[in-house]
Structures are given as structure tokens and as C-alpha cells.
A protein has these predicted regions:
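Catalytic cores of Mg2+-dependent Asp-rich isoprenoid enzymes
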Residues: 1-195, 206-332
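Short, contiguous alpha-helical
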Residues: 200-201
Length: 332
């Protein structure tokens, strides 16, 4: 992975990408820098949006300023150093301090790649701005998404769009498909991205509630005679379970699309298939864990441990050269 940008930026990338770094480092060289840079750019905006040291309006202004800077609408870099001191993750603080250096890397790519990076980043930031307006500027202490369409829109903006970008980079630099198959791959790529965001949402309900954010739509809760406030009470899990299972089922459908996405990638693209397999397998195992646990219990955080992740990496490396082994591992 070394040598993508420079030692400092590569270190920041590894420090901020956590488990996603496992996929980034397996990507083919032809698209690894573009995807890695988009990740760093999106991680910067996410860090701004989630900074605990700023008032909501300050964060919104900083996010909009960052958006203008990355899109080339402004030549003035946003002043983010004041937010860097509040980051518990040292690498995220360094990311904010190095915003000019990171953004300048966009111009190192072809015009079409620059356009793709900026387009996807703009969509992601639009989702983060919506999030800030919806939650941080809300009058109530616990604000909620209202309906399923809003949840789907959010999942597309912050994650489905990344699947779209990933697909565009792959089709531009790695392999070609006919127009019908290309359209299908884009659709499945969007669902792939949404699946990973839905897992985050369904796993992190207690921590989001603690921040005054409820991503489970209010109307869906009301249909089950529940409110966002009810989700603060872990004893409400059995009442919440039927609705929660509906969202897990939706996530599983998205993961099935992700598997189909991988199966559409040419077999010879070992690195690309392997980098896609990792989050899908980990995602499927996370969904299985979520089905049997009380997700409303803040003390019972559901997480795949590092030893199991390392084992998954080994399994993928062993399986990816073989069609049968890859299929069994994905569909096990």
C-alpha cells in the first residue's frame, strides 16, 4: 500500500480507514489511488460533520466551505485546524490539518477521473449536510428520519454513491461490459454500498440515539406502536424486533445484490473480486449476529472481532483464484 501518495498521507489513510483499509490495499493498482483518495476526501467531510467541538451552524458552514473547495468553486481552503484538536482519532485530526494537500491530489488524475471523484464526493457531502440539518439543527432532543424514502435517499448519498463510483472506476480502468450488463452492474453496485450503510445504521442504534439521531423512520416506528424515544429502553427490543428484522431482511437483499455484483466481475480480476468479497462476508456475519441480539442494549456492542476478520482475509485469499471456492465462501 505504500507509495500511493506519500508516507504521511498513506499513514493517515491507514489510520482513518480502519477495516475498510483491508479492501483498499487489495484493490488493483489502476484504481487504488482514486478510490483511496475519495475515501480520504469523504472521511474529511465526515470528520467535519461529526466534530464534537463545534456548534451545528459552524459545522455546517465548514462543510459547505469544504464542498466549495473540493469542487473548485473556491480557491480558499476551509479553516479546519480548530476542529482537529477535538478528534479522538489522531489520524482524523491530521486529516483535517492536511486538507489542502489531500484535495490537491485530485488534479493528479485524468479529467474523467477528477469528474467522477468530485461528483461522488459532492453526493456524499450533500447527504452529510442533510444529516446536519435534520439532526443537529433540530429543536427536539431526539430527532428522527420520517419515512423509508428518506432513509433510502440517505443510504444512497453516503454509501450507494460510493458503489456507483467504484463501478465507474472499474469499468473505466479494468474491464468492459455491454450496455445492458453495465447498467445492471451499476444498480447492484449502488445496492452493495447501501448494504454496508444499513449495517452501520442497524448496528449503531444506541450510539446514534445518544447523539440525538434516530435513523429508524418515525412512520415505521409508529406503525409498530413505537416512538424514537422507546428505542432508548433496551426492554423494548421484543416490541421492536419485528420492524428491526424487516430492515435486516432489506439489508440481506442488498447483500445478495452485492454477491451478484462480485459474480459479474471477470474471474481474472482477482484483486478486485477479493477486495469486494471482504466487506460482504464480514457484513453477512454481522447481520447474523444482529438477528439474535438486543441491539438496543448499549453495553452489548455487536462487532466482528479482529481474529475473525483476519481469518476471513485468509479465506478470501485462498478462495479468490477459484470460482467454486469463491461462490461457496460468499454464499456460505
Amino acid at each position: 500500500m505504500s507509495g500511493i501518495f506519500n508516507s504521511e498521507l498513506d499513514s493517515i489513510l491507514e489510520g482513518t480507514s480502519r477495516s475498510f483499509y483491508l479492501s483498499l490495499k487489495e484493490l488493483p493498482r489502476a484504481i487504488r489511488p482514486q478510490v483511496s483518495l475519495l475515501y480520504m476526501l469523504a472521511r474529511t467531510s465526515d470528520t467535519i460533520a461529526d466534530s464534537e467541538g463545534g456548534e451545528p451552524k459552524e459545522l455546517l458552514e465548514a462543510l459547505e466551505s469544504y464542498d466549495d473547495f473540493t469542487q473548485g468553486r473556491s480557491s480558499d481552503a476551509p479553516a479546519l485546524s480548530s476542529f482537529s484538536q477535538f478528534q479522538t482519532n489522531k489520524s482524523e485530526g491530521l486529516l483535517l490539518k492536511n486538507v489542502e494537500t489531500v484535495v490537491s491530489r485530485i488534479e493528479g488524475f485524468s479529467d474523467s477521473d477528477q469528474e467522477a471523484i468530485r461528483s461522488c464526493l459532492g453526493i456524499i457531502i450533500s447527504g452529510q449536510i442533510l444529516d446536519l440539518n435534520r439532526f443537529s439543527l433540530a429543536e427536539e432532543d431526539l430527532a428522527s428520519i420520517e419515512k423509508n424514502d428518506e432513509l433510502d435517499d440517505y443510504a444512497y448519498r453516503v454509501a450507494g454513491s460510493v458503489g456507483e463510483f467504484w463501478t465507474r472506476m472499474s469499468l473505466t480502468h479494468l474491464f468492459k461490459l455491454d450496455s445492458e450488463k453495465e447498467k445492471e452492474l451499476f444498480e447492484k453496485g449502488i445496492r452493495f454500498g447501501k448494504s454496508l450503510q444499513m449495517i452501520n445504521i442497524l448496528r449503531d442504534i444506541p450510539s446514534d440515539l445518544a447523539l440525538g439521531r434516530c435513523y429508524i423512520p418515525r412512520k415505521s416506528l409508529e406503525e409498530h406502536k413505537l416512538s424514537p424515544q422507546d428505542l432508548l429502553d433496551k426492554s423494548k427490543m421484543e416490541s421492536f424486533r419485528p420492524l428491526y428484522d424487516e430492515y435486516l431482511d432489506l439489508t440481506s437483499k442488498y447483500l445478495e445484490s452485492a454477491i451478484q455484483y462480485i459474480e459479474m466481475i471477470p474471474h481474472s480480476q482477482f484483486r478486485l473480486r477479493g477486495s469486494c468479497m471482504l466487506p460482504v462476508i464480514i457484513g453477512k456475519r454481522t447481520v447474523s449476529l444482529l438477528r439474535g441480539r438486543n441491539v438496543l442494549d448499549r453495553k452489548d456492542r455487536i462487532k466482528i472481532d479482529r481474529s475473525e476478520i483476519k481469518e476471513v482475509v485468509k479465506q478470501v485469499v485462498m478462495a479468490v483464484p477459484f470460482k467454486g471456492s469463491s461462490k461457496r465462501l460468499l454464499r456460505d
